[in-house]
Swiss-Prot record:
Domain (VOC) ranges: 4-127, 132-251
UniProt cross-references to InterPro entries, sorted A to Z: GLOD4, GLOD4_C, Glyas_Bleomycin-R_OHBP_Dase, Glyas_Fos-R_dOase_dom, VOC
Underlying gene: glod-4
Superkingdom of this protein's organism: Eukaryota
Origin species: Caenorhabditis briggsae
Keyword set, alphabetical order: Repeat
Family: Belongs to the glyoxalase I family.
Function as written in the Swiss-Prot or TrEMBL entry: Thought to act as a glyoxalase. May remove methylglyoxal from mitochondrial proteins. Has roles in reducing oxidative stress and increasing lifespan.
Listed name of the protein: Glyoxalase 1
Length: 281
């Protein structure tokens, strides 16, 4: 499959604290921000049907960078993290030096680990280039079963394979997925995330058919999502053997939808100022 790694979705409970962490600590930029009056048809915001918002944040254009999607549900002000998400790996000398001067812990391979306000961990390593998201690490209950799903069913190439972990990618230079054998059953709790990829639009239906033939899990069958004032996007939502959610979108519509909005951070800050949901829920 000619797929492209796009982003990972986090549910966040406090937008003000979260945006400060990502912009001031990880030095990311707000790329676009969207507000919605009701829940997403493809459960983009989780199992909620109230008002919500989506903020894309990262180190550059979504055409060229793997970024993050921060989902905020107005009625929800706390999520419980499970053991499904492990970490996101970012390398940069500049960022490494900065993190070394603030509260952190040392992780494996010489990286420094920090957490966002909701507890999502990031591992920062040294590299002579601007900050870049290199890898998403997810825990799995059965490494062989997961490897077979991602490699054989979804077509991700194996980059490196070790006894307790496998690194996969849809192509050179793309953000990798690293699946890591967990010593316990995967419990995603309420703070579960979602990883997203794009495919040429005409390949989405064949992908869905392939998953059905293999008796794989389809959370949302192929549908078209509308964003007010922006491009429509086709999506199909899958789940791997550990129920990690996987979104595949039509690449053509998504490239149009995902253009950088220079006014996004200003709009987000204004929405944060107006948000009085804690008084109501």
């Amino acid at each position: 499959m000619t797929a492209r790694a796009l982003h990972y979705v986090f549910k966040v409970a406090n937008r003000a604290k979260t945006i400060d962490f990502y912009t001031k600590i990880l030095e990311m930029k707000v790329l676009r921000h969207e507000e919605f009056d009701k829940g997403c048809e493809a459960s983009c915001n989780g199992p909620y049907d109230e008002r919500w918002s989506k903020t894309m944040i990262g180190y550059g254009s979504e055409d060229e960078h793997f970024v993050l999607e921060l989902t905020y549900n107005y009625p929800i002000h706390k999520y419980e993290l499970g053991n499904d998400y492990r970490a996101i790996v970012i390398d940069s000398d500049q960022l490494f030096d900065k993190i070394s001067r603030i509260d952190h812990r040392k992780s494996g391979c010489g990286r420094l680990a920090v957490k966002d306000p909701d507890g999502h961990e990031f591992k920062i390593g040294k590299a002579d280039h601007a900050p870049k998201v290199l890898r998403v690490q997810l825990n799995v209950g059965d490494l062989e079963k997961s490897k077979k799903y991602w490699n054989e069913l979804l077509g991700m190439g194996i980059v490196e394979e070790k006894k307790t972990r496998v690194r996969l990618s849809f192509g050179e230079g793309q953000c990798e997925l690293e699946i890591v054998q967990s010593g316990e059953k995967i419990d995603r709790k309420t703070g579960f995330g979602r990883i997203a990829f794009s495919l040429p639009g005409e390949k989405l239906q064949p992908l869905q058919d392939k998953i059905k033939s293999a008796n794989g899990t389809i959370i949302n069958e192929l549908l078209t999502l509308k964003t007010p004032g922006k491009a429509d996007v086709q999506v199909v939502i899958l789940a791997d053997p550990d129920a990690h959610e996987i979104c595949f979108v039509g690449d053509e519509g998504f490239r149009d939808l995902s253009k950088i909005d220079d006014a996004a951070e200003k709009e987000l800050r204004e929405q944060i100022q107006k948000d009085d949901s804690e008084k109501w829920y």
